Amino acid sequence: MTILVIAEHNNAVLAAATLNTVAAAKAIGGDIHVLVAGSGCGAIGEAAAQIEGVAKVLVADDAAYANQLPENVAPLIADLAKSYSHVLAAATTNGKNFLPRVAAQLDVDQISEIIAVESADTFKRPIYAGNAIATVQSSAAIKVITVRATGFDAVNATGGSAAVEQISGTGDAGKSAFVGEELAKSDRPELTAAKIVVSGGRGMQNGENFKHLYSLADKLGAAVGASRAAVDAGFVPNDMQVGQTGKIVAPQLYIAVGISGAIQHLAGMKDSKVIVAINKDEEAPIFQVADYGLVGDLFEIVPELEKLV
């Protein structure tokens, strides 16, 4: 039994989610190979070779994979998948873009966002916004699976010595073209990788008031997130959204400010190690999952908290 893990990267840095995906592969058992598809991605291949538990790294260095267009990457994965029992990718934007296409090309079902491995063919995944856990069993010859990174502790990024093999790509499918992107730059940690996250909700009242959270976050070395209500109200951009339809986070510390705790939001942060809730409504659902709760005016509590940090 050999498992293919799709590396998550940007041609410069190997994403931490890859380490969680390898952990899921180790739980399944068998040899683990990692595919690095990109352009000028040799350094990523070397980094992947250092991951604990990886036996081989396949590097497909081709301009067609520079921007991770799924129309180009998915055929490569599908072609390689025929030699593997399982294909795993992190449940990121890329992973969710690649693997449904791969599953369709292989004519198998895809299993989404697993959080635990029961056996080589049986997995657990959240349903109903995380309120229930489904145990699913696959009879497919090749199991195509996305992995929720927060469900598995990352393996060590060093300690391995896997062989690195250069492979030929499948080229440009000619079905799409990369036009451009606008990346928001921030000195704060990336939301899904941060050890501390400070999130604001509708209780912030407007986008200007998020300055209180930015100030606190900078003192804590934290990332800043938001509830869907805050995003829908136009307070902050949607790349800050935490929740079922946003980003799934599980930091060491999650501070929810002015967030009532809608089920969709809880699905995205309830696995955080320590949850602190600040809300004026003592009946807010967020307090049901919080380890510590502060009931009061956030515009008084947050500045006071910042002074104490």
Residue ranges and their predicted role:
Residues M1-V309:
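N-terminal glycine-rich FAD/FM-binding segment characteristic of electron-transfer flavoproteins
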